[in-house]
Amino acid sequence: MIPFCFVVCASWAIWHIPAYILTLAPHANPSTLAQVTAIHESKDVTPGLPGLFGGVADVVDWLALALIPIFLVIGMFSVRVAQMEFQHWRSVDRVALFIGRVTMMLIISMTCVMLYEVFLRYALEAPTLWANELTLWIGGFVFLCSGFYGMQQRSHIRIFLLYDAVSRPLQRTFDVLWTTLFVLFAFFLVFGSYRQVFVIKFYNWEMFGTAFDPPIPATIQPAVLIIIVLVAIQAVLNVISDWNLEPEIHTAADDIDGDEIEAIKRTVGDG
């Protein structure tokens, strides 16, 4: 329930970011100001509500924004690790674990949108203008957030041929080396593109340019930089958390899912 509430509040706040921009940091350029104002007026879900604090963001916008960190904290401290997940987790992993639950909610939301579009298109012959682009938009966040969650779960693809053949101290050296390279990559990516992303794309609220016209460039590109920073931080936390673990030898048997095999046996037996 908490991940669902977080997704609802975050979705509302993201959709109404132009209201926050116009309230907190309006553009000095009259042309850009008029453009963002027009976007806000055309996309505002509650146009009848007056703005607060001398701006255009209304009470619902501010309430959604205020509830995001509240649901984040509640979700972090109420998350429970499933049996199939990485068991050697620590308190610092709670953010990634909760984002994993949020990602699952986004997948459900994306599936519902696709099913709704299929029903309208083929049953009623009345397709929507927004379902495909909304699916692309949600899918972008799913891809990014799952990368953050996957880093915490140690589920990214790794080649263990050399790693398993060396001693534990040398394994730690490899861990530090690849983590350092990844942190450097994240740093230079953010350093080299933050102005292009946060000023040109986000602050000017660049839209997708279609009939539905979602703000995919204005939201996905900043999310890329934010998530890459979180993934880099999580990579460092993983090295620290796994420092004293015993060496783990990986074999082909690790890829075998015993529960799945038993389920197949039961299915064949029932047939």
Predicted regions, residues:
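Alpha-helical transmembrane segments and membrane-interface helix-loop junctions
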Residues: 1-271
